[in-house]
């Protein structure tokens, strides 16, 4: 019981300074401006970086001190959209600044955790590819898996409530509520494709969404890790984390939710989350996976008021199932090896069956992505990039080389690279056709005139691609992961990887 109480009191004991006064500090907006200049290439440039100045910031702060109007009245929000096409610079600036302020508690928690554990910071710079060695170690020993789509909250208030454990400043939460209430529809459904935050303030939206996912996973994994210490009897679960230990102490006196859930233990359950999805895998029977499925559905419904249909969560055998994971088509492939054994004068052959994680390059989705951005047609035949024909030759070649290098870098861990070479061929020929179109010539004539050295930059050897080597996280394996495949210096996923 004490372990439960200590776990939850840890969040209570974290005291931070008030965040609300920071919104009146000029340095916050300067920091947001600097981050905007260095933002990822995947985020749209909304024009805020070019128009921000110290004079505008001071004018914004003076306007916020007004008592009658916070920024712009609700009646004017239709003409000056908060996340529209930059018609309201003040609203955009304050939302960028507020996103920086909300990140402060998370940054302080990360720094304190690194100082307490004395963790080498370079080990925390792992890329997304560091997930694959974990799958290689765990998944071949499992039998069933479910690809689960993490549901989005229906009500924006749920996103605000998930921050109440890390932000001890009620004024900041009220300010966030004011943003959402003043400029958005309260009942708007947040979806990954049509999010209200998608174009303008991705930083704030991602922070809210990641907080929501972190809240969901922290409760789920906490219950999972502590399941071995609980009796296998049915009981009513308190999902409110600050009152969970009360349920352990008083199992009969208090009832919060009417639904009775069965808690069960499975020492072989594995959980991986990525891009708004999660994979739940187990070595046990399909019956236990079915229990986990209905447990997740009731968990989302009771705690986050999110309805998810159980029929959309499918349980698949890993031998017969390929799942799309971070742009790769991953599956468990049996590898049979013949071993000859000899005992005295008798010798015999044994078939040794080993399971191996197979990661394939997604050829068809990648061709569809290239066709969408006009590098080829739907059949994979290269075409010229007409929108780049006005650029200089060096810029055209540089852009194609950069795209090909990023794809080669990202998919260098593929089990079979023949499909990757086909994509690189499409990019090379599309580059040549674009140059030939610019110079009003044919591909054959253009290559004959300039020679084969034009495209030498495309033929970068895979061994020359920079890779980061880190030791495995598993304590049972002390050796370095020697294959230069998964530990790469990739910090984000290119748009071409998002096939959906």
UniProtKB/Swiss-Prot annotation:
Q: Name one GO cellular component term.
A: chloroplast
Q: Does the keyword Manganese apply?
A: no
Q: Which GO terms describe its biological process?
A: mRNA processing; RNA splicing; tRNA processing
One GO MF annotation is: RNA binding
For this chain, the annotated S-S bridges are none
tRNA-binding as UniProt keyword:
no
Top-level taxon of the source organism: Eukaryota
**Localisation per UniProt entry:** Plastid, Chloroplast
- What UniProt keywords apply to this chain's record, in alphabetical order? Chloroplast, mRNA processing, Plastid, RNA-binding, tRNA processing
Record HAMAP family: MatK
The task this protein performs is described as:
Usually encoded in the trnK tRNA gene intron. Probably assists in splicing its own and other chloroplast group II introns.
Q: Which family does it belong to?
A: Belongs to the intron maturase 2 family. MatK subfamily.
The entry's protein name is Maturase K
What is the scientific name of the source organism?
Argentina anserina
């Amino acid at each position: 019981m004490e372990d439960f109480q200590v776990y939850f009191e840890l969040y209570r004991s974290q005291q931070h300074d008030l965040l609300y006064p920071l919104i009146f500090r000029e340095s916050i907006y300067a920091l947001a401006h600097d981050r905007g200049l260095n933002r990822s290439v995947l985020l749209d440039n909304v024009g805020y970086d070019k128009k921000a100045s110290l004079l505008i910031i001071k004018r914004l702060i003076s306007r916020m001190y007004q008592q009658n109007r916070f920024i712009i009245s609700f009646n004017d929000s239709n003409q000056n959209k908060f996340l529209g096409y930059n018609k309201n610079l003040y609203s955009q600036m304050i939302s960028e600044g507020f996103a920086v302020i909300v990140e402060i508690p998370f940054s302080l928690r990360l720094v304190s955790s690194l100082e307490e554990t004395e963790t080498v910071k370079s080990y925390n710079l792992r890329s997304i590819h560091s997930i694959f060695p974990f799958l290689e170690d765990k998944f071949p020993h499992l039998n069933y898996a479910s690809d689960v789509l993490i549901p989005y909250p229906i009500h924006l208030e749920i996103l605000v409530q998930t921050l109440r454990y890390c932000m001890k400043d009620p004024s900041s939460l009220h300010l966030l509520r004011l943003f959402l209430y003043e400029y958005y529809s309260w009942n708007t459904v947040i979806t990954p494709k049509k999010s209200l935050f998608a174009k303008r303030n991705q930083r704030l939206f991602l922070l809210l969404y990641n907080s929501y996912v972190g809240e969901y996973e922290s409760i789920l994994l906490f219950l999972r890790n502590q399941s071995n210490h609980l009796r296998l009897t049915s009981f009513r679960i308190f999902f409110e984390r600050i009152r969970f230990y009360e349920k352990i102490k008083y199992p009969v006196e208090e009832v919060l939710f009417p639904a009775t859930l069965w808690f069960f233990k499975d020492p072989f359950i594995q959980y991986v989350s990525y891009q708004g999805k999660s994979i739940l895998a187990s070595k046990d029977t399909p019956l236990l996976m079915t229990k986990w499925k209905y447990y997740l559905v009731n968990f989302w419904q009771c705690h986050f008021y999110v309805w998810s249909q159980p029929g959309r969560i499918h349980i698949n055998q890993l031998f017969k199932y390929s799942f799309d994971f971070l742009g790769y088509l991953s599956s468990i492939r049996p590898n049979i090896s013949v071993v000859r054994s000899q005992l005295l004068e008798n010798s015999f052959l044994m078939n040794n069956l080993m399971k191996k994680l197979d990661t394939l390059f997604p050829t068809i989705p990648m061709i569809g992505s290239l066709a969408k951005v006009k590098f080829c047609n739907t059949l994979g035949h290269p075409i010229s990039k007409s929108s780049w024909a006005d650029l200089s030759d060096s810029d055209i070649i540089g852009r194609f080389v950069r795209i090909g290098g990023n794809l080669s870098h990202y998919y260098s861990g593929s089990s079979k690279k023949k499909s990757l070479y086909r994509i690189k061929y499409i990019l090379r020929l599309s580059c040549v056709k674009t140059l030939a179109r610019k110079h009003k010539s044919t591909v054959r004539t253009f290559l004959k005139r300039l020679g084969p050295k034009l495209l030498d930059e495309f033929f970068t050897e895979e061994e020359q691609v920079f890779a980061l080597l880190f030791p495995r996280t598993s304590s049972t394996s002390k050796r370095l992961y020697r294959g230069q495949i998964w530990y790469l210096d990739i910090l984000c996923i290119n748009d071409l990887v998002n096939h959906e």
